[in-house]
Amino acid sequence: MSMQDPISDMLTRIRNGQAASKVSVKMPSSKQKVAIAAVLKAEGYVTEFVVAGDTKPELEVTLKYFEGKKVIDTIKRVSRPGLRIYKGANDLPKVMAGLGIAIISTSHGVMTDRAARKASIGGEIICYVS
């Protein structure tokens, strides 16, 4: 049986890994998953990510903790295969009044809501992280 929503699977693995206090989580890799992991690393939500393997590349995300507590409080999928959510540059949401981020897939790549607002481009809202 094939996976219906690989991005939701990635977010769930990260959420479950942090709940179980794992050091890292592994998952099948794709270009979009790597782009999301890069945004999470740039924003300080994960320590590192590595893509390994030739025939079946695997993405390993090293989770981040601060004083024994998980850094990612909530990570929630917004746009899903059954209901895509697109917003223009002026309608992009602010997560927790700017304390969290929304990860947006735009025509210029995957970026945060702040970067998309600054570049005046909208796109598909992938998830909220806080």
Swiss-Prot record:
Matching InterPro entries: Ribosomal_uS8 (IPR000630), Ribosomal_uS8_CS (IPR047863), Ribosomal_uS8_sf (IPR035987)
UniProt GO BP: translation
Keyword Ribonucleoprotein tagged: yes
Keywords from the UniProt entry: Ribonucleoprotein, Ribosomal protein, RNA-binding, rRNA-binding
Annotated GO MF terms: rRNA binding; structural constituent of ribosome
Gene3D superfamilies: 3.30.1370.30, 3.30.1490.10
SUPFAM superfamilies: Ribosomal protein S8
GO cellular component: ribonucleoprotein complex; ribosome
Similarity remark: Belongs to the universal ribosomal protein uS8 family.
Role according to the record: One of the primary rRNA binding proteins, it binds directly to 16S rRNA central domain where it helps coordinate assembly of the platform of the 30S subunit.
Complex formation: Part of the 30S ribosomal subunit. Contacts proteins S5 and S12.
Record-given protein name: Small ribosomal subunit protein uS8
UniProt source species: Psychromonas ingrahamii (strain DSM 17664 / CCUG 51855 / 37)
Encoding gene, per UniProt annotation: rpsH
